[in-house]
């Protein structure tokens, strides 16, 4: 008989995503000179969340249906990611063509304020690269234009989404107790590569933006999911989960407040923050009544977490466009506009697309029908 899925809705994970979004948006609007010099840690939290959720959902599909449908998985990912991205890129392209000579398309948020107009052909080429989810390699090679620079992280995640289900199909051929070890080995390689590249003379851009060096976050998220799923399936207790979660969260905050732009950010930052976040994420799922989970389960953070994708898509463009204005104007206007656009995107673009994506879910056996709404809810935020 098919078994019920293990992954249900977690408002605390939404809240963690919302908190990570606050860190990233603040970092971009204040050019790392604001209250969160290490706001880049929010991206590493995103990566761990993505690795955990995608892996847990794939394992749940296998547990519930006895198989994985790759076409349906890719269709669901397309429904989740493409509509909002296409709208944002369309709006940006129209504005770019309409105001191509305007200094409002300055180089970077918080840059030197020179206001050099963006090269139209290069910018339009970047749209194509973004749609192909290869933007991170443009920046890794040091040839990207700034207005869409933030989309490099989406490229890394999408490359992971393409490859990871294929790896999961191989992993499930192993005994459950052994599945985690190949993934840990891959994560160790990804965490080591920055030092190899740095010693070899490669620049920090290649290290920071490369898929091979940034996969560590999603791989450690996958490790957390594999461990969590096996533990929940067997009923085995976790070792000191509360202590590990608080140590992990504290370490993330230390990096957030103390580690700005520099070699640490590229060399050890992603791996250390990912190691810390992988202690937090499964704990929030297991202990929704814990102090840490309740602290993240606030209405504002959950709202932000559920709409984080659209906020992330729009905020950097607004930070770029508003850069010439005084920060007392650009920051509140940019943040407010980002939230308004995210609200509209969630209501009229993302929510309809998510409803449409349900047709790409395998029909569950009758024995598990009452539980199917729960994993769908959490999947919507992944």
Stretches with model-predicted labels:
Residues 16-28, 49-50, 88, 178-198, ...:
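Small-polar-interrupted transmembrane alpha-helices in polytopic inner-membrane proteins
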Residues 23, 54-56, 90-93, 160-174, ...:
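Membrane-interfacial alpha-helical segments at the cytosolic side of multi-pass membrane proteins
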Residues 60-101, 105-123, 129, 153-162, ...:
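Transmembrane alpha-helical segments and their boundary/interface "anchor" motifs
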Residues 297-302, 351-382:
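Membrane-proximal cytoplasmic C-terminal regulatory module of class A 7TM GPCRs
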């Amino acid at each position: 008989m098919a078994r019920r899925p293990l992954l249900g809705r977690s408002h605390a994970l939404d809240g963690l995503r919302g908190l990570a979004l606050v860190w990233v948006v603040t970092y971009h609007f204040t050019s790392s000179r604001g209250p969160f010099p290490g706001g880049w840690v929010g991206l590493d939290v995103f990566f761990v969340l993505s690795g955990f959720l995608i892996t847990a959902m794939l394992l749940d599909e296998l547990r519930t249906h006895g198989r994985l449908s790759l076409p349906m998985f890719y269709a669901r990912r397309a429904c989740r990611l493409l509509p909002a991205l296409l709208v944002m890129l369309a709006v940006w392209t129209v504005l770019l063509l309409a105001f191509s000579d305007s200094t409002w398309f300055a180089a970077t948020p918080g840059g030197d304020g020179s206001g050099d107009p963006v090269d139209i052909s290069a910018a339009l080429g970047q749209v194509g690269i973004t749609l192909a989810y290869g933007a991170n390699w443009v920046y890794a090679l040091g040839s990207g234009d700034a207005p869409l620079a933030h989309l490099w992280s989406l490229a890394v995640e999408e490359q992971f989404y393409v490859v990871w289900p294929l790896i999961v199909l191989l992993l499930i051929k192993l005994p459950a107790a052994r599945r985690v070890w190949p993934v840990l080995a891959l994560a160790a390689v990804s965490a080591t590569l920055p030092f190899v590249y740095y010693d070899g003379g490669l620049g920090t851009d290649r290290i920071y933006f490369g898929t091979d060096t940034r996969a560590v976050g999603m791989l450690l998220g996958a490790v957390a999911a594999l461990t969590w799923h096996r533990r929940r399936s067997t009923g085995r207790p976790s070792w000191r989960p509360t202590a590990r979660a608080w140590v992990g969260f504290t370490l993330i905050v230390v990096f957030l407040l103390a580690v700005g732009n520099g070699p640490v950010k590229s060399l050890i930052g992603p791996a250390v923050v990912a190691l810390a976040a992988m202690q937090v994420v499964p704990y929030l799922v297991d202990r929704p009544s814990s102090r840490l989970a309740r602290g993240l389960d606030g209405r504002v953070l959950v709202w932000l977490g559920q709409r984080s994708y659209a906020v992330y898509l729009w905020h950097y463009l607004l930070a770029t466009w508003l850069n010439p204005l005084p920060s007392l104007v650009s920051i509140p206007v940019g943040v407010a506009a980002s939230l308004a656009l995210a609200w509209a995107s969630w209501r009229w673009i993302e929510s309809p697309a998510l409803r449409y994506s349900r047709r790409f879910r395998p029909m569950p056996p009758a024995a598990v029908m009452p539980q199917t709404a729960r994993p769908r809810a959490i999947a919507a935020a992944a």
